[in-house]
Amino acid sequence: MLNSTGELEFSNEEDPEIISQLTSLPLSGGKSSAGVPEKTGYPDSVYVMAANIFQGIRIEKSAQKVLIKYGNEPLRSLSESEDQSFQRLSYELAFSALKYQDILETILIDSCIFPSTTIPDHLSSLIIVMLYDFQDRKFQTRVLSDNEEPISEVQEVENLLNSFKIKLAAALARCRIKHDALSIYHILPETVRKQELRASTLPLYAWINTCKISPEEVYNNLKRRGYNKVKSVLHIDDKVFAVDQHCYDVLIFPSHLKNDLINIDLFKDYKLIFQDKSRSLAVHSVKALLNMDDDVLMVNTGSWYTVSHMSILTNNNTSKVFVCGVQSQAKDPDLKTLFTKIGCKNIEILHEKFINIESKDHRLQKVKVILLLPRCSGLGVSNPVEFILNEHEDTEFLKDHSQGGISVDKLHVLAQQQYEQLTHAMKFTKAQAVVYCTCSVFPEENEAVVKKALEFQDLGNKGQPYRLSPPVLPLCSLKEIQLSTDKFFRMEPSEITNGCFLSILTRERDPSETVSVNDVLARAAAKGLLDGIELGKSSKREKKKKKSKTSLTKGATTDNGIQMKIAEFLNRETKASANLSETVTKPPLPQKNTAQVGASSQTRKPNKLAPHPAVPAFVKNTCPSRPRERQTHFLRPRPEDRMVALKPIKIVLPPVFMPFSSPQGIRSRMPTQHLYCRWVAPKALVPTCLPTHSLSRKEEKPKDDTPSSLLRPPRRWL
């Protein structure tokens, strides 16, 4: 029991008019407007839970500055309430008491509660949190619920505070006068006050579980419930929602609608899930770097909703999401139950710490992207209570926020831990990218860590070195573009979003591993992504294009050489044609020379058809232009080193008949096809049964009704 000696003595020392004046003064937060409903207090279980939270996060002082002693034993509660609303109320009450810890301790000393009364040390935390709520209610009596079971420790502390109500109000008034402040809210540091102001307007962010419902279905469902789609929810008191500009599956709601939203089926069935936007930015950055069958390794995820979001985004792929750092295997059944409710199927839990996992672990050989969410100061978060509840952060997170800053020593410790994790992530040779994300506003935890890791990265690994890559998220404003000029993605704390820092490290491309289009298509065909489409060989036109590209790389001297070769070729062909025409126009040679010509004709084809003296000259004019064009196609240069010297031989030939003899004589006269091709007769003088030479038959089909047997080329002489 509390010893409250002197309570009655003090109760008669003050005038009732002074009491009413003190209680009517604005107290914490300056929220004394008529529109704000009067607070009636919290249930007993909330006070006990808040006292235990405060006991773990309170600011410890040196022995010379200790005003109140705190015990180390937590208070026992009748039942651990798992209701999220009770947890939120307890954390908010503990965090508020932590921000005003110095002021509340001063009021307790000034009001003579300490050390005039004998109070057990383990109740000091409960007195602090209940005193904050007492002054926030303007020292009004708490309204008790009939269904609530009272807790003895709470009842004792409440009776003590009510008995010292007047003196507590006077001590609070003197404290405000000392600091020249309208309320104790204005005694807080400016950074903390700005943080509270941002938290009051910060909207709610929720991502759509596309595994269960499409965005269009969510829009229609909300519209049926009276929600209107707008571009911005800022300063709007109606039931509205907006779509985030950076993440297509994230919706934004005004903060005052949370109690209404958590009771609808979309949130109860895990079709919409509340989460801070910074986590969605990190997850979408990873998704933009993944291929169809790439795995992901997530480090220090905090909230399992972040893992679930990553799993939902890769649901259509063959990717796996590995999560490391889950040391307690007892949580596995609960996690699997949660993942089943959300619809996640590709999550694998690793119980080792990230630092203890080897880079050559056989389970992580397909991991291409590592998402690193290191523990940071988190001072970019405006509403730390919501962040702790949603992201499962340590309660130590609240201590730094209550003071609006962090000590230099603690900042260095955090930066060193972040550097070690980042450098360890860069040792995974199979990984191609690392996404580094924090909620800190200090460069020591952001740019400095990334630049140091890039500068001192181990270049002895088999993989290519890492480099800083630009953001893969869309930049939606000029301010975002200016903040991302150095390839870092930043979002400063504001009334619409928490602060966020995002960096993407990717490996430099190996110049020896150039992948062609055909390789990509072949890889896709092997995976069955082309629906059975067969890849054909490259066409002749593509080959000619490749040859033309290689020829274009030659210099001007090569072009001049080609022109000289063309000129030499034309001169040689002109001389060859002139010599051939001279030999054909000569008179008939003796039989010996004729045999020599026949032998040479068997060796090679004539380059050009020479007119026979017996054939009239008008035959040249009657020939169509197309055969002449084809004749030029057969003109090929013959190098001199390949010329074969012909020796005269004796060949006994049958009697030679003139071209105007009978067809039988013509047919028996020609020993070879080449000699046969030399005789050309005018159409008017040659009978219809005269066989056409093979060259003209190939070039142009006869128009007369000559029998097919006569059009056959004659056989060689046996």
From Swiss-Prot:
Q: Which Gene3D superfamilies match?
A: Sun protein, domain 3, Vaccinia Virus protein VP39
- Active site, per annotation: 439
Pfam annotation, one family: Methyltr_RsmB-F
Which stretches are tagged as biased composition: Basic residues? 538-549
What biological-process GO terms show up in the record?
A: RNA methylation; RNA processing
Q: Which InterPro entries match?
A: MeTrfase_RsmB-F_NOP2_cat, MeTrfase_RsmB-F_NOP2_dom, NSUN5_7_fdxn-like, NSUN7, SAM-dependent_MTases_sf
Q: Could you name the domain of life of the organism this protein comes from?
A: Eukaryota
Where is composition skewed (Polar residues) in this entry? 591-604
Keywords, ordered alphabetically: Methyltransferase, RNA-binding, S-adenosyl-L-methionine, Transferase
Q: What class of enzyme is it?
A: transferase
Q: Give me the ranges of the annotated region Disordered.
A: 536-557, 578-616, 694-718
- Which family would the database say this protein is a member of? Belongs to the class I-like SAM-binding methyltransferase superfamily. RsmB/NOP family.
The UniProt function text for this chain reads: May have S-adenosyl-L-methionine-dependent methyl-transferase activity.
Q: What is this protein called?
A: Putative methyltransferase NSUN7
Q: Which organism is it from?
A: Homo sapiens (Human)
